[in-house]
Design a protein with these regions (language model features):
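C-terminal extensions of enzymes
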Residues: 266-301
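Helix-centered, glycine/charged polyanion-binding patches within enzymatic domains
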Residues: 1-6, 191-264, 272-276
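Charged, often Cys/His-bearing segments associated with DNA-binding zinc-finger transcription factors
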Residues: 1-45, 58, 87, 98-111, ...
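Short capping/connector residues at structural and topological boundaries
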Residues: 15-18, 22, 28, 32, ...
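Pocket-edge structural micro-motifs
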Residues: 27, 117-119, 291
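Flexible, active-site-adjacent loop/turn segments at secondary-structure boundaries
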Residues: 8-11, 15, 21-25, 33, ...
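Polybasic low-complexity intrinsically disordered regions
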Residues: 40-71, 75-79, 86-215, 219-220, ...
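General structural signal for alpha-helix termini and helix-helix connectors
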Residues: 79-83, 268-271
Length: 301
């Protein structure tokens, strides 16, 4: 007897693909009041700020989602407001670039009982591209973004941007400092985090670090290395594959999946040239990914 073969509903399939490109713009009734909520309030020094931070954040989010330069982002914001029948001023590209470094991004969501950490590189555009063309790959440079991912809802709960020379173990402490991790939390990472400094920080915060020990790892009697000694004994008796299975080490692939989604959605390079702006740009992408995983309801008319 032939196996049942499901028939493809091509009409529905084509409609769903078309819906992926649909655009919904919702403008609240209080948009005009929030757009200029500062009302020209004077800052600490210099000229008063005209636009509040959330207006600039809106423009920068549009820039990242649609991969636009800042000037084209300004044109997009003007067009959306014009088509919606709303007459509001739009910040220019210089304002977006200048105030980006001072923006306060939203807090990271709270994690459950486990967080998976990893890092990836983001290329830098600008003068380095010309230097790479002339002098070869030795002049190529990038920035590293370190992320902590909660495996259950696939949300990014920690983020940090460092220069390319920073080792993953050196970013372990400041990365976890950006997350709200309770005592007893489990942190999963690759072999790059098999360092005494990482275990010392995990022991200080009463966290459990799960990382495969090196092939020639030896047991040390320091109290901070208790989890590492336990992992070494388990690997010697069970073997590395069985130890990974008992520790559910395969969850580490979720961090790699988050890196792939980050680059697939926003590209593998950074548009900003200044270091503070590069940090904000990379972390803003992570926050946008979180917003896509936690959609909000739009009130209907």
């Amino acid at each position: 007897m032939n196996a049942f073969k499901q028939k493809m509903h091509w009409k529905k399939y084509n409609r769903e693909l078309a819906d992926r490109g649909s655009l919904t713009v919702y403008l609240g009734d209080d948009l005009a009041s929030k757009w200029a909520s500062n009302n020209g309030a004077a800052a600490d020094r210099g000229r008063p700020e005209v636009y509040p931070d959330h207006v600039l954040l809106l423009g920068l989010v549009l820039q990242q989602v649609y991969r636009l330069p800042l000037r084209q982002t300004v044109g997009l914001m003007r067009s959306v407001l014009k088509l919606s029948g709303v007459a509001l001023p739009v910040p220019d590209s210089s304002t977006l670039s200048r105030r980006r470094r001072h923006l306060v991004l939203p807090h990271w969501p709270k994690s459950g009982r486990c967080v998976v950490i990893d890092s990836t590189g983001l290329q830098i555009r600008g003068p380095n591209t010309w230097l790479t063309t002339v002098h070869g790959r030795k002049r190529r440079t990038h920035r590293k973004i370190h992320l902590g991912v909660d495996p259950d809802p696939s949300l990014i709960v920690a983020g940090l941007v460092t220069p390319c020379q920073t080792h993953d173990s050196e970013a372990f402490d400041p990365l976890l400092a950006t997350a709200e991790l309770p005592a007893g939390h489990e942190v999963i990472g690759d072999g790059a985090y098999d360092r005494r400094c990482c275990y010392a920080y995990a022991s200080k915060r009463r966290l459990r670090l799960v990382t495969p020990p090196r092939s020639r790892a030896v047991i040390h009697l320091q109290p901070d290395l208790t989890d590492r000694n336990r992992a070494i004994r388990a690997v010697r008796s069970l073997g590395t594959p069985e130890w990974k299975r008992t520790q559910h080490y395969a969850r580490r692939s979720l961090a790699e999946a988050a890196m792939h989604r980050l680059k697939a959605a926003f590209g593998a390079g950074l548009r900003s040239r200044l270091w503070p702006n590069q940090q904000k740009e990379a972390l803003l992408r992570a926050h946008i990914l979180n917003s896509w995983n936690t959609p909000k309801r739009i009130p209907s008319d």
